[in-house]
């Protein structure tokens, strides 16, 4: 647990200026997407996701979380999601078309990166040892929220990877005493339901790239592989604490 919060403090201390820059770009693109969703804005948002996910993979996990026993597998996981967004950018599948049906949950999740540090400070924590807006769970909640606001024809593979990640957060609430992740895990359940509801109500399962059966097998392979590795590393961490 000490290593977990120590790496977070080191990450925040060294990168807080970069995090502010990343957040400002995200705020700008989100406002532009809501007010004037032109093609260049949509492309810019996808590039932003690719860049931010790569940042989490390389800077957060590979560099600053190198002391953690499971950093490499999570770095790979985020690299996979960055590649998935790159594929989506090139294929043009996710349309980022506005869908006002899920505004309440969507806006709540989009604002969650700012709620995370407030929640940490409410627990008596102080900077730099707090959750920040450019950390994995904050980025995931923001992405899920944005995709809910623009849920017409979304990339199901990316959505399921995001929801899979949010469930991983449940384990961290116990092992690393980080109840902030309950916010992510609890919000992902209704979000996943709404995504599938939209998916089948609009018959998107008939127009999926890659094809539905390939998405299914790919998702199963990725989730099983990551699940096995994470379960093993979490058991190791529990054994160390015993």
Regions found by a protein language model. Name each.
Residues 1-66, 242:
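N-terminal topogenic module of multi-pass integral membrane proteins
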Residues 38-50, 98-106, 150-162:
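Membrane-interfacial loop-to-transmembrane alpha-helix junctions, especially the N-terminal start
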Residues 50-56, 76-85, 141-145, 166-169, ...:
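Alpha-helical transmembrane segments and their membrane-interface exit regions
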Residues 51-59, 109-119, 162-174, 227-233:
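Aromatic-anchored segments of alpha-helical transmembrane domains
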Residues 70-74, 174-190:
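Loop-to-transmembrane alpha-helix initiation sites
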Residues 231-242:
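Juxtamembrane boundary at the C-terminal end of a transmembrane helix
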